[in-house]
Structures are given as structure tokens and as C-alpha cells.
Amino acid sequence: ADIKIDKISDIIKLTDKYPYDNKVQYNIDINMLHKIREPLKKMNDMIGMENIKTTIVNQILYYLKNFHKISNKLSFDDINSDKFQSRYNRDSSYNRDYSYNRGSSYNRGSSYNRYNRSYSNFSIQNDNNDYLHTVIYGPPGTGKTEIARLIADIFSRIGILKRNYFKKVTRSDLIAGYLGQTAIKTKDVIKDCLGGVLFIDEAYALGNAEGRDSFSKECIDTICESLSYYKDDLMVIIAGYKQELDTCFFSYNKGLESRFTWSYETEKYSAKQLQQILEKKINESGWRSDFKLGHKWFEKNKDSFASFGRDMETLFMKAKICHSKRVFGLSDENKSVINDEDIENAYKMFLDNKKNETKTFNNNMYI
């Protein structure tokens, strides 16, 4: 029967229906689908993000069919071309410092060569013909970091990335205090991520709208160069608001945006989705939800939750504090069950904290 896959749930159902057996011949790579089942299940359980989930499925099918790869076999003329020798020298130098042992991380100083030196049967391992670099647009608290982590996990399991390595950085991790040191600092971070994923959260903070920051220019130019130089060895994922990324990141280098060939956009959560996120966090923490406030309560108060999922996490934390006070001295059957009173009191604490944060910020403006 023909197999149609449109959604993540279709892949999960397929692995349920066909357990992997190495003695059975399949017309699809069922073993690989089983390998990515766990991160796909986590992604499928995330609230909302239907467009992102569909795009991820399309990417997976594309890569599983190996349409991203250039020809595996090289002629003698190909091997002796300037372009190939330049790449070979680059990778040989890289592998002397960062070599890969299966089942472990990259080890400095090991003697591993990525290329078979036999000219009669010279092959390239996992040579991606496409950029892997990705941009995730969206406001804070909408799951951008979690999506990035799952992408890294999935792509390492199917062999597109050589190791399951994920490094999250911000401006302070890339930009140094003196001109000239920023490029070195940025290159060191990039080399540390080779074979895996470099995730730059709030990448717009690297630059500014005026474009006058020499440190930012140095950092972003170094990133841009590395996007091509390590095209087959690195995935860079950036995240942030679309307008700010366009103004404060992509505008620094004309060739930058075209290197990010995959893009996703996380959307603001609805009141119903905020409720689902809170209930999910409660249940996953081993607690139970018994509040009857319902959708209307979240609809009335959703404007207070500008950071969406992150604010639901904060609300749950404060609800546990309020719950602890409410059940003090009561029997065990009342414990670890969040009710309406806990949520209402937690919301008051949440608003008080926001007021204090705003007051502190305003006072600091005059220091």
C-alpha cells in the first residue's frame, strides 16, 4: 500500500505499525524513522506550531531520500581540481584538531581522516550540498529554543549532523572587549560547534539599527564567512523577532540572509493554548490540575502574559508557592493539586512582580 506522510503523527503511526527488524527488507528507511521517533514525539506534543511541524516533516523526508547530497563518487580530475584540494586541505587541517569517534564527542588530537585516500574509489562522507542554517522568527516564550534543540537532535540521529551537540550563545559569548579579538572569540565558538548546532538566541542583539558598531560588524562578518566555509559541517540557528533580525543582523552583510535557507515562525499563543501549556506543565511535573477557571479566565488575562509559555512556567511556580501555604497542615490528599484559589493568588503574585520589575527599571534609568 502507498504510504502518505503529511504530519509528524503519520511518522509515529508508521513506527507503531512497523517495528524495525533487520531481517526484513523495507522500501523505506524504517530504521531511521525509529531513531527519530523520540524527538518527533516531543515535538508533536508541543502546543500549537502546526506549520512548523509540517515543515519539519518535509525536511526529514527530503534528507532521508539523500536529495541534499552531491555525487558520492569523484573522478581523478575532480580530486585534483583546485576547488577539491582547497576543501580537502581545509578538512584535513580541521580533522587534526577536531576528530570524531563514534559514540563520543569530538576529540582533539585524534588521528581521524574524513576522506578515503584511495583515488580509485574516492568518496565523500555526508557532504551536504545545501545550507543547513535556519532562522526561527517569533516573540519570547513561544518555544524557539526547544524547537532548535529538537531539530539538532533529529538531524544528528539521521546523520545530517555528525554529532548531537547543541550550544546556545548570546552576544556576550561572541563579542570581545577589543577590536580584533571578537573574530577570534567568534571563531573559537564556531569551531567548538563543528559537526553540531550553534544556536544564537536573540541574534538581533549582535548588532544595532544604526550599523555603527565595529565589534558587531566583525562578529557578524565572521559568522557569515563560516556559514559557507563549514557548510557541510555546521548548522547555525538564529532566533528572534523578524523586524529586529532584519534591521540589526541581516543588514550588516548582504550575503547573510541567503545562507539561512530554512525558516520557521512561532506564533503567539491563544488563550486556549496558554491554558493547555499550563496544564501540560502541571501534569508533567507530577502535580494535578483541578481548577475550573477555564478558557474565559485566560482570555481575560492573556495580555498580561507577554512571554507566553515562559509566563505559564512562572505562573505554575507561583501557584505551587500559594498551594504550599493553602494546604499547610492539611491531609496528604489535598497536596500537589492546583485549584482555582492557587491560580488566582499566583496571578496576583505574578502581577506584583511585574510591577516591581517595571519600577526597578524606571529607577535605574536615573542612576
Predicted region positions:
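Dynamic helix-loop-helix/coil hinge segments at AAA+ ATPase domain boundaries and subdomain interfaces
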Residues: H34-V57, L64-F76, S172, A176-G180, ...
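Conserved catalytic network of the ASCE P-loop NTPase/AAA+ motor domain
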Residues: D127-N129, P140, I158-K162, V189-F199, ...
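C-terminal engagement/docking regions of AAA+ P-loop ATPases
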Residues: R326-I367
